[in-house]
Amino acid sequence: MASNNVAQFATELKMPADVLLTQLRDAGVEKSSTSDELSKADKDKLLDHLRRAHGVAPDGEKKKITLTRKETTEIKQADATGKSRTIQVEVRKKRTFVKRDESTPEEAPVKAAAPVIDEAEIERRAEEARRQAELIARQEADLREKQERLAKLEAEKEAQAKALKQAEQAEAEAQKADAAKPVEAKADESAQEEKKRVAAEESKKKAAQLAKDAAKEASEKAVATEAARKAVADEVAQIKAMMNAPRRAIKAPEPAAPVAAKPAEGTLHKPADKKAGEKKDEKKPAVTADKKSIKSANVSSTWQDDAKKRGAGIKTRGNTGGGRDGWRAGPKGRRPSHHDDRESNFQAPTEAVVKDVHVPETITVAELAHKMSVKASEVIKHLMKLGQMCTINQVLDQETAMILVEEMGHTAHAAKLDDPEALLEQGEEHADIEALPRAPVVTVMGHVDHGKTSLLDYIRRAKVASGEAGGITQHIGAYHVETPRGMITFLDTPGHEAFTAMRARGAKATDIVILVVAADDGVMPQTKEAIAHAKAAGVPLVVAINKIDKPGANMDRVKQELIAEQVVPEEYGGDSPFVPVSAKTGEGIDALLEQVLLQAEVLELKAPVDAPARGLVVEAKLDKGRGPVATILVQSGTLKRGDVVLAGSAYGRVRAMLDENGKSITEAGPSIPVEIQGLTEVPNAGEEVMVMADERKAREIGLFRQGKFRDVKLAKQQAAKLENMFENMGEGEVKNLPMIIKTDVQGSQEALVGSLQKLSTSEVRVQVVHAAVGGISESDVNLAVASKAVIIGFNTRADASARKLAEANGVDIRYYNIIYDAVDEIKAAMSGMLAPEKREQALGLVEIRQVILVSKVGAIAGCYVLEGVAKRGSSVRLLRDNVVVWTGELDSLKRFKDDVKEVKAGFECGLTLKNFNDIKEGDQLEVFEVQEIARTL
C-alpha cells in the first residue's frame, strides 16, 4: 500500500502518528494533521534530519572500512612414526577502521541511525544539552571571578612597592641634610644647640624605626600576595584546561607491568609473542593537536609476525619451539598444545594463611582439602603421618578431621549441617488447641514366665499366650480395653533378658507400669531391670503379685524382696499399691484395674485431639503382601488415613490403618494403638512418628536422615577398623562366625543381634553380616555365599527360589521361633570353633640300664620300667642327672624280639628314640602323652 499521507506513513513505520508529526516539524516539514499529504521530498528531508540527529553524514559518506587479510604458511611436523609431514596453516586477520568527525572530537562513535526516534529520546538529549550549557556558564563565571581577584592582588602589590620606595627616599634625604648641616660652635648658643641636636637624633631614630617596620610589613605582604597570585593562576589554568579538553575522552590507563599487545580485533589466530627487546621500543599511538589518539598509527606493529624470525634456522626433530605463535606439537602425535613463553609477574604469598575451617559431622578427604585450599595429596600425607591410610573419597568423622585441620596449622570449628529437621521445631507447639482427657497407656512388665500375657489375656478375655511360641512373649503387643470406668491401653513386653531395649521402649511410651511378680518365684533379674526402667522413665508402679492360687505362694517374701529394691507398698507408707491377683481364676483383676484408673486420675492425663498426630513406633515388620508395616501408639492428635507421616528415615502416606484386631479404621486418637501401611521402609522400633504438612518436606527430611546415618556409621566403622588394626595384629588370628539374621519384626531382630554379639570372646567372634526384617530371599543367600555365612530365620521362612539356591551352594539355613534355642545353638557352634585345651598326662618312668650300638639302627637302649607304663609312639623326655636333655617320642618298643604296644612296670624292654642317639647308661626316660580337651564358652 502506498503511504501518501501522515497517518499511512506512521502505520507503515509502526509508530504513533502524533510522534511522527513532531519529528516532521523538527525536520522543517510543516504538517498540521494526520491527513496531510506527504511527498517524497518530505520523506527525504525527514530521513536527512534523523541521520544528522544520529551522527550519520547526510551524503551517505562511508565512515568505516574493514580490511581482511589471509595468509597461508606451511609447517613441518613429525608424526607418531617419526615421518615428517607438511601442515597447511591459514591465518585470517580482520581490522576495522572508523573515521570520526573532527569537528566534534568529544563525541563517541554511535551506532547506525535508527529509522525513527521517540519523544523520550529527544527530551533526554535536550536535557543533557541544557546541563552542559549550565556547566559551561558556571565554569566561565568562576573564571571571571578568579581573574578579577588576581587583578586586585596585583594592584595591591604595586601600591605596597610604591609606598616602600617613598619611605626609602625620605630616609635618604634626612641623612643628606644631617651631613650637609655646618657645625658652629658658639658659646652663647650652646644650650640651644644641644637641645636641637637631641631633638634631631630622636626624630632620626623614629624615622629609621618607621622605615624598618614599613619594609618588613611590605615584604610579608609581598610574599602572601605572591602565594595567593600563584594559587589563583594555577586554578585559572586548570579551569581553562578543563574547558578546552574534549568532553567524553577517556584516558588510557598506564600499564603497571609490560604485557603483550592485544590481538587484533576479529583475528582468527593468536598473534606471535614479541621479543623482549621489542617490548621496550614498542610504538606508541600518534597523538594529534586536539589530543585525539589515532589507532591506525600503529597498525604495522599489529601485523608483525616474529614467529618466523624465531623459528628461522635449521629445523630438527628435537625443536620444541617449532610452530607459529608458541604452538608446540604434542609427544608421539598427540594434539598440539599452546605454551605461553611470557613470564608471569605473580609472586606467591610469603606468609602462611590460617583459615577457619568449619568441619561437619562427616566430610571426605577431598572436601576437607578444598576447605583448607590445599592439595588432597597433602592431606593424605598428613593422615599417613597420623597412622591412617585413606583415599580422597574416604569419609572422615568430625573428630579425626578436626585433629587433622589443627595439625596442618588451621583453626577447626565444629559445624552443623544444614539440618532440615529444624523446620520440625516450628510446628511442634499446639498451645492454642484445647487438651482433652485421654486414656492411660499401661505397660505390663516382669520376669519371664511370671504370667504377664496371661494376666492381659484374662483382662482382654482372649487367648493370646497359648498362641505364643514356647508360651513366652517375643514381641511387644499393644491392645486397648474398654472397662466400665473407661478405656485403658495396654503394652505387653517380653520378659526374656534379650529384650532389654524393647522393655525400655515400653517404659518410655507409658504412663503407668504394672509390675507382675510371681508369688512362688519372687523378685528375679528381669524384675529388677523392669523396676530400673520404670524409675528411669519416672513412671508410677502398680505391683501385681500373680499366681496366688498356687500352693507355694508366699506374698510376704515377695513384699520383703520388693522393699529391698526400693518398691514400698502403700500399707507400709510407700507410694506403690500391691494387688494380689490370679490370672488363672481372675481373682483380684477388678481391683488391679481400679488401682490403674485411680493412678490415671491422679496424673490428669490430657492430649490435644484436633491436631496433627504424633506418636511412637512400638513395633515394625516387613509383610510379604503389604510391605513395611508399623505398629504405632498415637500419643497426641488424631491420625487419619491419607496423612503423610515421618518415622525416623521412613516416610510415606498412610494407605491403610488397622486396629489390634485387624479391623480397618479411618482415624485414631490419643492412646490408641494402630497398624499402618504405606511407609517407604521398615522404621526402627522406638522412632518418633509425626504427621507432616506435605510429602515433599517428609521426603527431604527422611533422605537427609538416611544420608546422615549412613555417613556417621561409615565414619565410625572406619575409625573402629583403624583402632583395632594393630591390636589384632599382635594377637593370634581371631575366628569369625559370620551370620545373616532375618526376623519377623524389628524388635526381635534387635534382641537377637544383641544376644548373639554378647557371645563373642577374644578367640571367637560373632560377625553379623546383615540383619533385616522379612523373609529369606535369593539376595540373602547370595550374600551368604559371598561371606560364607550361616542364615538364621527367626519366625521367617525362605521362599522356593531361595531354598533351591541355598541347596545348590551348600548354604546352611537355620529356623528358630524361640530365642533360647537360637542363642544356645550358636553358643554350641562357637564352642566347637574354640581351640582345644592341651593337657599333659604322665604315663611312666623308664631307666636305661644298657646301651647297644647297631650300625644300621643306631643306639638301642635296654631299659627297665620303674613305674607306670611305656607306650609305643608316646612322647618322652630324656633326663640326665634330673635335667631335661631332650624331648621327643619313642620310635620303637620291643620285648625280646617282638614289637609290643606297651610295657608295664616291673618288666624289661628295648627301645629306640626318634632321631636321637646320644643316650647313656643311668639316664631316665619320662613317658607322657598330650590330651586335647574341648572347651566351652
From Swiss-Prot:
<feature type="binding site">
    <location>
        <begin position="546"/>
        <end position="549"/>
    </location>
    <ligand>
        <name>GTP</name>
    </ligand>
</feature>
<dbReference type="InterPro" id="IPR004161">
    <property type="entry name" value="EFTu-like_2"/>
</dbReference>
<keyword id="KW-0342">GTP-binding</keyword>
<feature type="compositionally biased region" description="Basic and acidic residues">
    <location>
        <begin position="173"/>
        <end position="205"/>
    </location>
</feature>
<dbReference type="Pfam" id="PF22042">
    <property type="entry name" value="EF-G_D2"/>
</dbReference>
<dbReference type="Pfam" id="PF08364">
    <property type="entry name" value="IF2_assoc"/>
</dbReference>
<dbReference type="InterPro" id="IPR053905">
    <property type="entry name" value="EF-G-like_DII"/>
</dbReference>
<dbReference type="InterPro" id="IPR006847">
    <property type="entry name" value="IF2_N"/>
</dbReference>
<comment type="function">
    <text>One of the essential components for the initiation of protein synthesis. Protects formylmethionyl-tRNA from spontaneous hydrolysis and promotes its binding to the 30S ribosomal subunits. Also involved in the hydrolysis of GTP during the formation of the 70S ribosomal complex.</text>
</comment>
<feature type="compositionally biased region" description="Polar residues">
    <location>
        <begin position="295"/>
        <end position="304"/>
    </location>
</feature>
<dbReference type="GO" id="GO:0005829">
    <property type="term" value="C:cytosol"/>
</dbReference>
<dbReference type="InterPro" id="IPR013575">
    <property type="entry name" value="IF2_assoc_dom_bac"/>
</dbReference>
<dbReference type="Pfam" id="PF03144">
    <property type="entry name" value="GTP_EFTU_D2"/>
</dbReference>
<dbReference type="InterPro" id="IPR027417">
    <property type="entry name" value="P-loop_NTPase"/>
</dbReference>
<keyword id="KW-0547">Nucleotide-binding</keyword>
<feature type="binding site">
    <location>
        <begin position="492"/>
        <end position="496"/>
    </location>
    <ligand>
        <name>GTP</name>
    </ligand>
</feature>
<dbReference type="InterPro" id="IPR009061">
    <property type="entry name" value="DNA-bd_dom_put_sf"/>
</dbReference>
<dbReference type="InterPro" id="IPR000178">
    <property type="entry name" value="TF_IF2_bacterial-like"/>
</dbReference>
<feature type="binding site">
    <location>
        <begin position="446"/>
        <end position="453"/>
    </location>
    <ligand>
        <name>GTP</name>
    </ligand>
</feature>
<feature type="domain" description="tr-type G">
    <location>
        <begin position="437"/>
        <end position="606"/>
    </location>
</feature>
<dbReference type="GO" id="GO:0005525">
    <property type="term" value="F:GTP binding"/>
</dbReference>
<feature type="region of interest" description="G1">
    <location>
        <begin position="446"/>
        <end position="453"/>
    </location>
</feature>
<dbReference type="GO" id="GO:0003924">
    <property type="term" value="F:GTPase activity"/>
</dbReference>
<dbReference type="GO" id="GO:0003743">
    <property type="term" value="F:translation initiation factor activity"/>
</dbReference>
<feature type="region of interest" description="G4">
    <location>
        <begin position="546"/>
        <end position="549"/>
    </location>
</feature>
<keyword id="KW-0963">Cytoplasm</keyword>
<dbReference type="Pfam" id="PF00009">
    <property type="entry name" value="GTP_EFTU"/>
</dbReference>
<comment type="similarity">
    <text>Belongs to the TRAFAC class translation factor GTPase superfamily. Classic translation factor GTPase family. IF-2 subfamily.</text>
</comment>
<dbReference type="InterPro" id="IPR015760">
    <property type="entry name" value="TIF_IF2"/>
</dbReference>
<keyword id="KW-0396">Initiation factor</keyword>
<dbReference type="InterPro" id="IPR036925">
    <property type="entry name" value="TIF_IF2_dom3_sf"/>
</dbReference>
<feature type="region of interest" description="G2">
    <location>
        <begin position="471"/>
        <end position="475"/>
    </location>
</feature>
<dbReference type="InterPro" id="IPR005225">
    <property type="entry name" value="Small_GTP-bd"/>
</dbReference>
<dbReference type="Pfam" id="PF04760">
    <property type="entry name" value="IF2_N"/>
</dbReference>
<keyword id="KW-0648">Protein biosynthesis</keyword>
<feature type="region of interest" description="Disordered">
    <location>
        <begin position="157"/>
        <end position="230"/>
    </location>
</feature>
<feature type="compositionally biased region" description="Basic and acidic residues">
    <location>
        <begin position="267"/>
        <end position="293"/>
    </location>
</feature>
<dbReference type="InterPro" id="IPR009000">
    <property type="entry name" value="Transl_B-barrel_sf"/>
</dbReference>
<dbReference type="Pfam" id="PF11987">
    <property type="entry name" value="IF-2"/>
</dbReference>
<feature type="compositionally biased region" description="Low complexity">
    <location>
        <begin position="252"/>
        <end position="265"/>
    </location>
</feature>
<dbReference type="InterPro" id="IPR000795">
    <property type="entry name" value="T_Tr_GTP-bd_dom"/>
</dbReference>
<dbReference type="GO" id="GO:0097216">
    <property type="term" value="F:guanosine tetraphosphate binding"/>
</dbReference>
